[in-house]
C-alpha cells in the first residue's frame, strides 16, 4: 500500500504545471529567449508561456507565438506576411475586443514600438472580466517570418498593474528573438 501511495505522489508531483522560475529562459522551438523574474511561477502551453507571481487573475505576463496562417480565436481572422505593425495591432485589438469575457474594452494607447530590434507595436487597454474585475494590459507585438509574437502584461488595475509594471518592463526589455530573417 505504501508503495502505491509513493508512486501516486511521484505521478502527481510530475504533473504539476507551475514551475518556480528566475533567470534566462530560452525556447528554441519558439525562437526566443527572455529573462524571467525571480520568485514568479511559469506555465507553458504549446503556443504560450505564462508567468505570474500572485496568480493569473491578479497579474500575469504572457509570451505567445502564433503562426500567421492560424485563425485568431475570437474573430477567425488571420495575419498576413508583410502586414504593417499598425495593421497587426488593429487585428489583435479586434480579436481581444471580440472575446465575450472582455467587457467595457477601452484602448488607452496604440503606438509603434521596437521589439528585439524589429518594428512592432505597443498597445495599452483596459477592460472588465465577467466578475467585474477591472484589468489593464500592455501588449507589444510584431510579425517575424511567418509568426506573430506577443508579449503581454495583464493585471488588476487596483494595485497590481502599477506594482509589477517595472518587472514587466524588465522582462520585455530582455526579450530576444534567437533567429531573424
Where are these regions (language model features)?
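Surface-exposed amphipathic alpha-helical segments
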Residues: 40, 147-181
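Signature of long, low-cysteine stretches enriched in small and polar/charged residues
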Residues: 86-142
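Bacterial Sec signal peptide processing site at the extreme N-terminus
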Residues: 12-30
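Short, solvent-exposed coil/turn segments at beta-strand boundaries
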Residues: 55-57, 116, 142-148
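Secretory pathway targeting signatures of secreted, lumenal, and periplasmic proteins
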Residues: 30-90
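Sec-dependent N-terminal signal peptides
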Residues: 4-13
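Structured segments of extracytoplasmic/periplasmic soluble domains
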Residues: 43, 95-99, 126, 171-174, ...
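A mature extracytoplasmic/lumenal domain signature
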Residues: 38-40, 55, 125-129, 139, ...
Amino acid at each position: 500500500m505504501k508503495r502505491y501511495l509513493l508512486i501516486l505522489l511521484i505521478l502527481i508531483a510530475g504533473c504539476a504545471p507551475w514551475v518556480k522560475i528566475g533567470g534566462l529562459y530560452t525556447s528554441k522551438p519558439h525562437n526566443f529567449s527572455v529573462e524571467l523574474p525571480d520568485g514568479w511561477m511559469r506555465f507553458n502551453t504549446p503556443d504560450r508561456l505564462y508567468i505570474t507571481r500572485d496568480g493569473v487573475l491578479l497579474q500575469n505576463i504572457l509570451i505567445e507565438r502564433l503562426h500567421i496562417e492560424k485563425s485568431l480565436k475570437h474573430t477567425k481572422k488571420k495575419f498576413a506576411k508583410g502586414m504593417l505593425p499598425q495593421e497587426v495591432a488593429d487585428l489583435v485589438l479586434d480579436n481581444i475586443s471580440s472575446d465575450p469575457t472582455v467587457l467595457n474594452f477601452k484602448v488607452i494607447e496604440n503606438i509603434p514600438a521596437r521589439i528585439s530590434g524589429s518594428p512592432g507595436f505597443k498597445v495599452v487597454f483596459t477592460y472588465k472580466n465577467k466578475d467585474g474585475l477591472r484589468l489593464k494590459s500592455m501588449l507589444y507585438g510584431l510579425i517575424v517570418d511567418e509568426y506573430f509574437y506577443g508579449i503581454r502584461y495583464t493585471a488588476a488595475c487596483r494595485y497590481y498593474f502599477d506594482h509589477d509594471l517595472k518587472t514587466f518592463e524588465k522582462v520585455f526589455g530582455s526579450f530576444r528573438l534567437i533567429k531573424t530573417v
